[in-house]
Structure formats: structure tokens, C-alpha cells
């Protein structure tokens, strides 16, 4: 039965793609353009910097500087503070890459990776400013700050989820290879491109056109499409809050692909997205009422 459904869905999508080939082709080209202009420039350099950071003492510096209060507040190991700090700059799915690096080198365990993933669902600040450029700059700054704040709140809410870890006083720097780092960064970048193209192509086949529906599949496309509609600032902010909370199937697929061999439990991650959604909408409504 399962195979029958898979085959039926495959034939259905294949038929739709053939029938709507010009529309799908246009959507794919738009996806490539979006990735080239907004995603790749903000993600690729930071992934290489992340690899380079593992070859230096920067993780130890960060862990020794903010690791102790971070560990006490969130009940995570000190080295997890490095992931949170870098995630505020690079966002998702790069946060998964940082967590994967620590997990692969056995600096953290699987349970801690799950807990850390739930509270680092952030976005590259430059990317947010780019895709929300049709709105006032203060809205973009509000979105960046609020999203970081909500992830901190989620970390506090989840702090009592017990994990076992051995505190590491000093992490040994890893050997850095620029060629290997570029190769890994390109692989993740291509994964992101493939996800964006796939979901934007699927969106083009859906007869109902609405930014929220687009955002459910692919967030950057969903937010940028808002400028084509005559929504008020209030509705734009609420719609963006919803999309940033969920992140879109594209980003979730990318994150799961990075951890494909680690068999993480995503229940805490999904629960945290619901909390994220509720908090983001409530804070946005308060912000609209008090400041706009």
C-alpha cells in the first residue's frame, strides 16, 4: 500500500510537471536567483569560518567567556554557547552544521544536540533584512532581535529536559583543510539550493496562491512574495512572524539531511516551534499596539 501511494504520487507530480513545464521552469529559475542573491552569499562564508574556528582556540575562548553563565541558565555544556553565538549570526540550517561538527567530534552527545537544535532556530540577520527590505528597516531589526529573544526563552523553557554530558575544560583544535572545508560548504550550499528549488517548484503547482502557503514550503519565497500583495503592515508582520516561527519545510528538510545518519529525536524541536509561533505572534501584536 505504501509503495502504491508513493508510485501514485510520483506519477501525479510527474504529470503535473510535464503539463506545467513552463511554469515549473520559471519557478526553478526564480529559486536559483533567490539562492544566488540572498542565501549563498550569507551562508557559504560562515560555514568555512565555522570549520576554521574548530582549528583554533576560538571555541575555548567563547566557552570560557560566556560558557559558564550559558551552561547554568540552559543546563547545557559550555561548548554549546559557541553554537548559539554563531547561530545568531548565520541562522538555520547552518546551526545544524555547527551542532553536527560538535556531535561528530564527540564534544556533545545526541540528547544535547536535540536540545540545542530546538533553541538555535535562528536566521542570518543579513538574510532577514534582505527578504524584508520592502518593509521599514526597524521592522527587520525587530524581527532579528525578537527571534533571538524567543530562542532564549525556548532554551529556558526546555532547560529541565535532562541530558548527560561530560564537561570539557579545553577542546583540542582540529586540523583545518581549506579544500575540504570548501567542499563541505559547497555540499551544504547545494543541499540548500536543491531544497529551495524543489519546494518552489512544488509551490508553482499549487493552484491556491498565498504567501503563507508559499512560506509553509519555502520561507524566503514566502516572505518576498508578500510585497506583491497589498497587505497592511500589521498583516505583513503577523505573516512573517508565522513563517519565521515554522521556518518552512525546506529548512526543516535541510536540517534533517545534515543529521541523516545521527537519528535524532525531533519531538522537542517540533514542540519548540509551536512555542515559537505562539510567542512570536503575541510579541508582534504587543509591538504593533505599543510602537506602531
Residue ranges of each PLM-predicted region?
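Membrane-core helix-loop-helix motifs of multi-pass transport proteins
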Residues: 102-157, 258-283
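Juxtamembrane boundary at the C-terminal end of a transmembrane helix
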Residues: 282-292
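Transmembrane helical segments that form the transport core of multi-pass membrane transport proteins
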Residues: 56-58, 178, 182-244, 248
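Short, amphipathic, aromatic/basic-enriched membrane-interface segments that mark the entry/exit
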Residues: 14-17, 51-55, 110-119, 212
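Selected transmembrane alpha-helices and immediately adjacent juxtamembrane segments
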Residues: 8-23, 28-40, 44-48, 52, ...
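Hydrophobic alpha-helical transmembrane segments
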Residues: 62, 84-85, 116, 140-141, ...
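N-terminal membrane topogenic signal
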Residues: 1-9
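Alpha-helical membrane segments and immediately flanking helix-loop junctions
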Residues: 70-133, 215-227, 235-260
Amino acid at each position: 500500500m505504501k509503495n502504491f501511494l508513493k508510485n501514485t504520487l510520483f506519477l501525479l507530480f510527474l504529470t503535473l510537471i510535464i503539463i506545467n513545464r513552463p511554469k515549473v521552469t520559471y519557478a526553478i529559475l526564480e529559486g536559483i536567483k533567490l539562492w544566488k542573491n540572498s542565501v549563498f552569499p550569507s551562508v557559504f562564508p560562515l560555514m568555512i569560518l565555522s570549520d576554521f574556528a574548530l582549528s583554533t582556540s576560538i571555541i575555548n575562548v567563547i566557552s570560557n567567556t560566556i560558557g559558564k553563565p550559558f551552561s547554568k541558565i540552559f543546563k547545557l555544556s559550555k561548548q554549546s554557547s559557541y553554537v548559539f553565538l554563531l547561530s545568531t549570526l548565520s541562522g538555520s540550517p547552518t546551526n545544524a552544521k555547527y551542532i553536527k561538527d560538535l556531535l561528530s567530534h564527540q564534544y556533545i552527545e545526541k540528547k544535547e544536540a536535540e536540545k540545542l537544535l530546538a533553541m538555535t532556530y535562528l536566521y542570518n540577520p543579513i538574510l532577514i533584512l534582505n527578504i524584508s527590505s520592502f518593509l521599514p528597516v526597524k521592522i527587520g531589526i525587530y524581527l532579528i532581535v525578537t527571534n533571538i529573544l524567543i530562542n532564549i526563552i525556548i532554551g529556558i523553557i526546555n532547560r529541565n529536559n535532562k541530558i548527560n554530558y561530560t564537561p570539557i575544560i579545553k577542546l583540542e583544535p582540529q586540523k583545518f583543510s581549506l579544500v575540504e572545508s570548501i567542499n563541505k560548504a559547497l555540499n551544504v550550499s547545494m543541499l540548500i539550493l536543491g531544497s529551495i528549488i524543489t519546494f518552489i517548484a512544488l509551490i508553482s503547482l499549487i493552484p491556491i496562491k498565498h504567501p503563507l502557503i508559499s512560506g509553509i514550503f519555502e520561507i524566503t519565497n514566502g516572505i518576498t512574495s508578500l510585497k506583491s500583495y497589498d497587505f497592511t503592515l500589521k498583516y505583513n508582520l503577523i505573516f512573517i512572524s508565522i513563517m519565521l516561527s515554522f521556518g518552512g519545510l525546506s529548512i526543516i528538510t535541510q536540517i534533517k539531511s545534515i543529521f541523516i545518519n545521527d537519528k535524532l529525536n525531533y519531538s522537542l524541536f517540533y514542540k519548540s516551534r509551536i512555542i515559537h509561533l505562539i510567542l512570536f505572534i503575541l510579541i508582534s501584536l504587543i509591538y504593533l499596539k505599543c510602537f506602531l
